[in-house]
Each structure stands twice: as C-alpha cells, then as structure tokens.
C-alpha cells in the first residue's frame, strides 16, 4: 500500500467567545408583585404574580376537601368541569364553600380582583407550587368538559383540568415565545421564559422532553453567551457519529446510495480514485471495496484520498483508518493506495494537491456526506470548493445533506424549522427499535443535540450547521456547472430493503425526487442524496 500524509494549514474559525453573566441581567422592580406576570402576558393573559401563591394554596385546600368528600360518598361535584373561568380564585372558593358548608370562611389573606384573568396559571409544570401534599396532580389530569347538576340551585360551571398533552402544547408555545424574545433582544423576558421551559419539559416524556431540553440549553447558551469549550471540535463529532451510524439508518442510507452511484460510475474503469471530503472512521468504504472485488473481470486498482480535520491530541487518525482499509484490501485482493490530508476547511484544498490523473487513465469520484453545508459559514467557501471539484473532472459527485432550512437570515424562522426537524429526528430514534437506555442511543441524541446547540446558540463563522434543502443545493450546483444525474431505480429498491433492518422499516420512507433520493420519517424528508456530474463528461 502506498500512503502519503499531508497537512494543510488554513484559517479556521475563531473559537467561540465565552462570557459569564456577572450579577443580574436587569434590576428587579421592588413593586413587581403588583405588576402583570410578563411570562403569561406574552402568551396573551393578564395575571398578577402576587396572586399565584394564594390560588395555589386554595387549590391545595380543594384537593384535600374533594378527597374527603369522595370518601364520604359526596360526588355531586366530582365530575364538574369549569371551562375558561374569568375568576379562578372565586370559583375555587365557591367549591370549598359547597363542600364545607356556608360557614366556611374564605382565606383572609387572599384579595380577589376579578379584573385579572387567572385562567393561564400553568400549574406545577411551569411554576414551583407552594408546599403541598404529594397528591396534588391537578395539572396531570385529562381536560374534560361536561356538565352535571349540583345539590344547590346555582348553575354548574366548568373547570380546566390540564393534562400532559396540553402541557406539551404550552411547552412548544413557550419555546417559540422565548425564541422571539431572543430575536427582539429582550433578555429579561427570554431569561424568564427559558427557565420555565425546563420546568415544562419535566412534565413530558420521551422524544418531546429530550428535544425541549436540548433547545432550552441552546437558548440559554445564546442568552448568556456561554458555549462549551469543544463546541467547534469536529473530531469529537466524528466520534459521536459512530453510535449514530449504528442506531438509525440515516448514515447507512447515505453511504449505501453514494456507494451505489460510485460503483455504477466505475463499472468499466480499470483504475479508480475516490476523493472523500470527510473520511472520519472510513465506515463507508469497506462495502464499496468488497463490491469492487466481486466485479466481473476483476477489481480495478483503487486509490482513496481521505480528508479530515486535525486531531486535538495531534494523533494521525487518517493513517490509522488507512492502514485498516489496506489490510482489508489485501485480504480481498484489491490493489490499494491511500493518501490522507489534514485540513481545517475543505476550502483550503487545491486540486493540484490531490494528484489528479487524466480521466483516460483514472476515473475520479468525489464523495461529500454532510460535508458541504459548513462551508456556507465561510465567505466564498462553497464557491471555492465547487470550483475545485470542477477542476478534478470527476465522473460522479455524491452529495448527501440534511433536508432542512437552517440557514435563513431570520433567527426565529431558523429556530422554528430546527424545532420541527429535530423533533422528527428524535421521534425516529425512539422508533428505531433501540433499547431506550442504551449507550448508543444516548450518544446519538448527544450527536444531534450538539447540532441543535450550534444552529440555535451560534452565529457568524461559529455557526457551521447551515443546512439547506435539496432545491437550493441543486440550483447552486447547476449554476456552477455541475449537473444532477439520475441515481436510478436500482438504488431506490435497495435502499428500501436496507430500511427493513430498522424496526421492520416502520416509519421510514424513501422517495425519489427528480432523480434524487430522500430518506424521511413518515411524511417528513430528513436527508437527501444528490448525484452530480461535471460537464466535462
């Protein structure tokens, strides 16, 4: 095996600036107790913060009384429903009177003011309750609206009993409200909202809770400008990609469909050269090498150029991957040559560095799986790389990218799109059949969580997760003179068979879009594979 190693020095992104918030972001208003609660005001309600403890105390008393009433066989109010009351405190007091008799004395410390609408009190999910019995679960019960007659002549009024589904809706609305406050640079409101997001998320389970937690963390990092020290370390992401590869079919689909396109392009060639823009652990290439070894007429001479980022411990990870692939090539009888290039950015590469041979001697393929979108953070980066690709004169260029729009100019739009996109991804992870407590699943979620943090918390050159939809990539490439090619129905059929390995394929969908392949969860496309060819061919 021949192997060369080169390091390309280039200007990378500056490390994310970290700053800690000293003291408070704003001064507290000493008269704030009489003001409207700003968290609820932004959601459209008028509620005084000073009223909340009193209402919570009355709800606690009502829970105790209702429990006693059920034991005594008094059930006329057990199914009473009170829908959208304008005076929640007064209604609770009336119920206490009906249970305990007209001699019950209202709490002297509670001042009722019907001017304020207490409908929106989120309960224990959003506000820590006053000390109460563990049985206080009024926010967890199913909301229902039905009427029943009481022993008195007064008209029955409905009550809102909030369940976890309603809390989930409120969680999403609060996430959106916090993102809007961030966009408007309202740090006081954003700070209040992001704290309540964590409390609301605790009332959820499964994918919703995990997604909300990651988005809350990302919002908090953006608000307080606190970033993890390894937020821009690509080598760490490369390691996290391994369990993500094992847990769900997205990377396997990307590698499989790219290999199929490359294999078809190499069908008649005696010498082939693959330039991998992101070698990582080299997981994509053993399958292609084995397919080439079985080719009728014998395998071609296979040359692989792998590009990767510098390692924090200065180890030569590319060399280690190259040696493993060389051992495989020797076992299956393929002539193999490997070269590794260390680069901070693909924009630092020049075609002359890669020893490109004439097309009549060697057929070239360029492979870019989730590698092009970070170039959008660097002015002129994507244009430079596309120009280099054209100079390499490849027969096939395989591009796999996230089918999402996380690169718009408006923060709230990016946040909304990211919330929908990653909610679907986390949902698919839970449906992939992996044990919920497995380490691979936890690492896969961390892999996606780091992407969420970058999309939401970072800006400028530090924001590298700039995903764009297939239509934009196709237009960009066509404008640069790199034309899409049809991937073929064979790749579609085999990709569909691949999905059967993951929870029998339930939920995953492959679709063809103008010659491109997309993999999604139910009706939402999540990644797209675009095959390209230079006009030289």
From Swiss-Prot:
Molecular function in Gene Ontology: DNA-binding transcription factor activity; sequence-specific DNA binding
Region Disordered, annotated ranges: 1-33, 131-157
Compartment annotation: Nucleus
Domain GRAS: 162-533
Region called PFYRE, residue ranges: 364-454
Span(s) of short sequence motif VHIID: 272-276
Region described as Leucine repeat II (LRII): spans on this chain: 320-352
A GO BP annotation: response to abscisic acid
Sequence motif DELLA motif, location on chain: 37-41
Positions of region (Leucine repeat I (LRI)): 169-223
Principal place of residence: nucleus
Keyword field: Gibberellin signaling pathway, Nucleus, Phosphoprotein, Repressor, Transcription, Transcription regulation, Ubl conjugation
Sequence motif: LXXLL motif, positions: 372-376
Region (VHIID): 241-306
Coiled coil (UniProt feature): none
Free-text description of this protein's post-translational modifications in UniProt: Phosphorylated.
Region SAW, residue ranges: 457-533
Pfam families found in the cross-reference section: DELLA (PF12041), GRAS (PF03514)
Low complexity bias spans: 9-20, 147-156
GO cellular component: nucleus
Family statement: Belongs to the GRAS family. DELLA subfamily.
Domain notes: The DELLA motif is required for its GA-induced degradation.
Matches recorded under PANTHER family: OSJNBA0084A10.13 PROTEIN-RELATED
Free-text function comment from the UniProt entry: Probable transcriptional regulator that acts as a repressor of the gibberellin (GA) signaling pathway. Probably acts by participating in large multiprotein complexes that represses transcription of GA-inducible genes. Upon GA application, it is degraded by the proteasome, allowing the GA signaling pathway.
UniProt-recorded name of the protein: DELLA protein GAI
Organism of derivation: Gossypium hirsutum
Gene label: GAI
């Amino acid at each position: 095996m021949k192997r060369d190693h080169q390091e390309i020095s280039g200007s990378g992104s500056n490390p994310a600036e970290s700053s800690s918030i000293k003291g408070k972001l704003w001064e507290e208003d000493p008269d704030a107790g009489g003001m409207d609660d700003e968290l609820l005001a932004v959601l459209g309600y008028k509620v005084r913060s000073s009223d909340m403890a009193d209402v919570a105390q009355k709800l606690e008393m009502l829970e105790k009384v209702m429990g006693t009433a059920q034991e005594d066989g008094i059930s006329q109010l057990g199914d009473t429903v009170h829908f959208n009351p304008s005076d929640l405190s007064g209604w609770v007091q009336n119920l206490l009177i009906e249970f305990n008799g007209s001699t019950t004395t209202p709490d002297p410390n509670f001042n009722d003011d019907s001017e304020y609408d207490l409908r929106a009190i989120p309960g224990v999910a959003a506000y820590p309750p006053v000390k109460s019995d563990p049985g206080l679960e009024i926010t967890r019960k199913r909301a229902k609206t039905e009427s029943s007659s009481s022993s008195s002549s007064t008209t029955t009024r409905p009550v809102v009993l909030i369940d976890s589904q309603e809390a989930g809706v409120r969680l999403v609305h609060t996430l959106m409200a916090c993102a809007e406050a961030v966009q408007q640079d309202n740090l006081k409101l954003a700070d209040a909202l992001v704290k309540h997001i964590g409390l609301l998320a605790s009332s959820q389970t499964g994918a919703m809770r995990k997604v909300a937690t990651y988005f809350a963390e990302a919002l908090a990092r953006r608000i307080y400008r606190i970033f993890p020290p390894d937020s821009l370390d690509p080598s760490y992401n490369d390691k996290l990609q391994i369990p993500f590869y094992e847990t769900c079919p997205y990377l396997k689909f990307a590698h499989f469909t790219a290999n199929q396109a490359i294999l078809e392009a190499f069908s008649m060639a005696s010498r082939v050269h693959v330039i991998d823009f992101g070698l990582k652990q080299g997981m994509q290439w053993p399958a292609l090498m084995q397919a080439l070894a079985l080719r009728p007429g014998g395998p071609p001479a296979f040359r692989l150029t792998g590009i990767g980022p510098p390692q924090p411990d200065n180890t030569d990870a590319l060399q280690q991957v190259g040696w493993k692939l060389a051992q495989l090539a020797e076992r299956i009888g393929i002539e193999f040559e490997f070269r590794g290039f260390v680069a901070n950015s693909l924009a630092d590469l020049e075609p002359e560095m890669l020893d490109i041979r004439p097309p009549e001697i060697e057929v070239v393929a360029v492979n870019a799986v989730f590698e092009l979108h970070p170039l959008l953070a660097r002015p002129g980066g994507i244009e430079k790389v596309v120009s280099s690709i054209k100079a390499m004169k490849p027969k096939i260029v395989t591009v796999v990218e996230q089918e999402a729009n996380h690169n718009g100019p408006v923060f709230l739009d990016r946040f909304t799109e990211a919330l929908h996109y990653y909610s679907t991804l986390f949902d698919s992870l839970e449906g992939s059949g992996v044990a919920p407590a497995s380490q691979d699943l936890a690492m896969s979620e961390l892999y996606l969580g780091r992407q969420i943090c970058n999309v939401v918390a970072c800006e400028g050159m530090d924001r590298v997760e700039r995903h764009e939809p297939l239509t934009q990539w196709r237009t960009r490439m066509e404008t640069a003179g790199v034309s899409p090619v049809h991937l073929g129905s064979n790749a579609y059929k085999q990709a569909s068979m691949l999905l059967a390995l993951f929870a029998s394929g339930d939920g995953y969908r492959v679709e063809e879009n103008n010659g491109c392949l997309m993999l999604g969860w139910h009706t939402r496309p999540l990644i797209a594979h675009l095959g390209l060819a230079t006009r030289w061919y």
